[in-house]
Design a protein with these regions (language model features):
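Well-ordered mid-protein domain cores that form the structural environment of catalytic cofactors
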Residues: 58-108
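Buried hydrophobic packing segments
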Residues: 50-57, 167, 190-198, 255, ...
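Conserved nucleotide- and phosphate/pyrophosphate-binding catalytic cores
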Residues: 197-384
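Flexible loop/turn segments at secondary-structure boundaries
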Residues: 40-41, 73-75, 123-125, 215-218, ...
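Short, hydrophobic/aliphatic alpha-helical segments
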Residues: 27-35, 64, 165-175, 273
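N- or domain-start disorder-to-order transition segments that initiate the globular core
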Residues: 1-26
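N-terminal catalytic cores of NTP/NDP-binding nucleotidyl/phosphoryl-transfer enzymes
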Residues: 17-78, 182-188, 194
């Protein structure tokens, strides 16, 4: 008998009601779809939540189809956005997609997985087929989306390509003959549009199963790699542990339930809860030995108020002054120069214990040389 509780664990909605049970009763492997646009290089623990549901289906004999949206990324999902997304380059899409495949297989069963690029079918549609696709939905129906409605009422631009996005995602379901589609709660509209388009193409419509979205470590914004507010499943153990420990206390119940799939609630003491979460999270993705080492390193840094013994020594570039955002990005202490500037403006970059001011982007070489550098939770030494 199918274990429905395992399949729907932590699900927010399963639509239509009773449809998943009916499909399971057919006794054949279901085709379970999850689409991810490769807008960043790493899968974070929030994106792992629906991937875990896909693995639960695979463990019961069903087929998981992970669709990397290399074609839809050229449009960008407008869900939850107040303005049009910037279009990504083909080179960036291809690079990110390769990493998504690699990381997703840390969660999924390779033997029960199909890993696909939606350019396989979307790139072949002719204009006649696109017109057929657009006839499956009305503009008034599209404007029912909260994000489109809000932008329309405030005279914010909405491109026709954005209107096409939910239809492109829906056509993915047609192309692979999806029985179930997984997605975050912000994807409910797109998932239900997939049902409508499948019906228009003469297919049995998919079940829509939505999973919760979680906030990133700052506790304010949703977890997002593009915002730099995330914990990546491929983060190094020490970095993963540090990000977990820097998370706001209020996140722990959701993080335990959704990211660890823990049955018991977190400890009542906030610090103990975060330590246990950080250790268990690193253990989940890197193993017990790495978790123990990360915890020990954290204790050396923060309990003893000093950098770890193996803090890297960073060579200064030529020139004076040193442009700090470039220096941090070049040494992988920030994901980009823009992220480095944000860290500086937030007081998150310190030289010998003193935070750099928001306008201190260029620092004299003499001040940098030999200094202890702290960026967020990480330490380094600058060569003298």
């Amino acid at each position: 008998m199918p274990d429905l509780a395992a399949l729907t664990r932590n699900a927010v909605k399963v639509l239509p009601e009773g449809e998943l049970e009916r499909k399971l009763a057919l006794g054949r492997p279901l085709r379970v779809k999850l689409g991810i646009d490769p807008t960043a290089r790493d899968i974070h623990i929030g994106q792992a939540i629906p991937l875990q549901r896909m693995r639960a289906f695979q463990d019961q004999g069903h087929t998981g189809i992970l669709i990397v949206g290399d074609y839809t990324a050229r449009v960008g999902d407008p869900s939850g956005r107040s303005k049009e997304r910037q279009v990504m380059s083909g080179e960036q899409i291809d690079e990110n997609a390769a990493r998504y495949f690699e990381q997703a297989l840390r969660i999924l069963d390779r033997d029960r997985s199909e890993l696909r690029f939606n350019s396989e079918w979307l790139g072949k549609l002719d204009f006649g087929e696109i017109l057929r696709l657009t006839r499956t939905i009305t503009v008034s129906r599209l404007l029912e989306r909260n994000d489109f409605e809000r932008r329309f009422k405030t005279n914010q631009p909405i491109s026709v390509s954005e209107f096409l996005y939910p239809l492109m995602q829906a056509y993915d379901s047609v192309a692979i003959k999806a029985d179930v589609e997984l997605g975050g709660t912000d994807q409910e509209y797109n998932l239900l549009t997939g049902r409508d388009v499948q019906i228009a193409y003469g297919q049995e419509p998919q079940v829509a199963l939505t999973t919760p979205l979680i906030n990133g470590p700052n506790g304010v914004d949703k977890m997002s790699a593009s915002l730099g507010n995330y914990i990546g499943i491929d983060d190094p153990p020490a970095e993963m542990y540090g990000k977990a420990m820097s998370s706001v206390d209020a996140l722990m119940p959701d993080y335990y339930r959704l990211c660890l799939e823990a049955d018991a609630p977190p400890p009542a003491d906030p610090y103990a809860a975060k330590r246990e979460f950080a250790r268990r999270l690193v253990e989940r993705w890197h193993g017990a030995e790495a978790a123990a080492a990360a915890e020990a390193g954290f204790d050396r840094m923060f309990k003893e108020k000093r950098a770890t013994d193996d803090a890297p020594v960073l060579e200064l570039p030529d020139g004076d002054p040193v442009h700090v955002p470039a220096f941090l990005a070049d040494h992988s202490l920030a994901g980009s120069r823009g992220e480095a500037r944000r860290l500086i403006s937030q007081g998150g970059v310190r030289l010998d214990g003193e935070p750099l001011a928001a306008d201190e982007l260029d620092v004299p070489r003499s001040r940098m040389a030999g200094a202890e550098l702290r960026v967020g939770r990480r330490f380094a030494r600058v060569a003298g």
